[in-house]
């Protein structure tokens, strides 16, 4: 066992709170507070879906074709900062993102190909 990090916050970006809430219905922030106050209760999971984030950059531009001006049932949020795409070489190299929720693990590529562009 190796200690990697001790941190008073949840995971970065949208991953901890937003994606957990979308996938399971569980309030992750409330859970963190309950752990800190030593009153944590086992969560009641109300949803069993998949969610994720796709970051917009030069390498992922094909996934975003025709998504820019359209909305799809699986699309929770999109944030496009610029269409002057740059190549991602690190964690913060992105030009926007989209957040999705769907019923099956990792079907988004197929859904985008089917509904986003041909």
Describe each PLM feature range.
Residues 60-118:
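Long, Lys/Arg- and hydrophobic-enriched amphipathic alpha-helices
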Residues 2-5:
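Protein kinase-like catalytic core scaffold
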